[in-house]
Every structure is written in structure tokens, then in C-alpha cells.
């Protein structure tokens, strides 16, 4: 089950049922099944608090993924700062909705085992994001 909640922000005008079906399809293409995935859409202050408290990082970010997956069943809590998504969209000169979909997919891709921290991993993640967006 995939759920979306908000904290300190309004829910974006997105078709949640379509997004959920899309994320399930993305998982299946990577040989995974969806367990409990909770998205919390929040503001910069909340994501900074989470980043400090749980990861000991003192900076803003667009997404934090806590992975509780087991074998081929993906599960986790995914925090997304809508403030950072908006500023990234402006900086990258892409639409807000497009950037939000990219970040939403990014979280599921992390749960599917794709990382973006090591050498060459960022390119792998970007390719996976692009493939996921094609499915949408």
C-alpha cells in the first residue's frame, strides 16, 4: 500500500491513484512488489529536522528515504520537501509537476536498491528515473 500525507504544506494537485498505479508498475519492472510505502510531503524546515535528527546531516535536501524493504517487497518512509522540489524545478528550468514526479520516483527507486552516492551511481539513478518517467 502506498500512502501520501502532508506536514506543513498543502497536498499538490496530483492524481494520487494514477501516481500509485505508476509507482507499483515501476516496482514491478524492477522485479519488486510494493509493501507499505509512506510518502510524507513537507516543507524545508521539516526535512531539515528529519535530516538532523536521524541522519546527523545539517542541510536541506529534496528527499530522504528510510528503507524497510525485505527481499523483493519494498517498504519505507519517504520524506519529500516540496519547497526544495520547487526551487530545484526553477533552477533546472523544468515544470514543478515534472520535478515532483521525478523525486517521487527517486524514492521508490531507492527502495528498489538503486543508490546515487557512489561513483557512477548518480548516472544509473538518473537513467532509472528517466525510465520510470517514461512509464508515467
Segment roles from a protein language model:
Residues 1-101, 112-136:
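An acidic/histidine-cluster motif and surrounding catalytic segment
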Residues 109:
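Conserved ATP-binding N-box helix of the HATPase_c
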